[in-house]
Amino acid sequence: MFDPRRHFGEIIPSRAKRCAFSVRQRISLAGAFMSNDDVYAAGLLNRALDPTTQPAAIQAFWRAEVDVLRKVITEGMRVIDFGCGTGRHLLQLSDRLCLGVGLDYEHSYIVEAHRHATGRPLYFITCDAVAVPLVEALDFAMCLASTWGTMSDKTAVLSEMRRLAPRPGARLLSVYSPASVPARREWYRRLGHAVTEEAPEYLMTEGGFRSEHFTEARLRSLVGDCIIRPLADIAYLVTF
């Protein structure tokens, strides 16, 4: 039986003690400093999960992710989800998992994930994705819904994914492609975060949220040896 006391180091729920989920960037907006951390803490994810806020292209992307996971994640696997939010993906896969571990820096999301995980082989922890308090390697690591594109220390997150799922090909990212920009602009507007800056590699909103998109060339430069496949017209799946 999985004993979290044996596998986890110190779990740090306090934001003051967290070194930032991936050294999140802080920006100045109307004289105030905000970050993705602040925006998520204000409940952005909870609103984003509401299907009525999602353009059709975003809904198709999320459905395609789940379809892929149900093909990749097989019976009895042990899986870790980086940036799990409220545990959506692990909860959907729990019927086939031997163990699911979800991690996120936003403690309120972890509390919500725990609330739905009763009786399932799932554990959720508040921690930093660049310093996961887990000792033993698992079978598979994933970072989905372009969460990796909101992290600034992407290389360190990849290193932790490799450490915790050392088998080549046992790590999966899903990220937005440049084709996602129109759908994301509309989605963020519906969420009350209208886009104020569009750059070749990211969108920035008036609420302080920064979300990146990736070309295949940029992905290969960041990830290294990997397999890249298009997903739902607006994203890529990256296996490494």
Where are these regions (language model features)?
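Conserved class I S-adenosyl-L-methionine
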Residues: 2-73, 172-196
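Class I SAM-dependent methyltransferase SAM/SAH-binding core
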Residues: 87-130
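Short alpha-helix
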Residues: 206-225
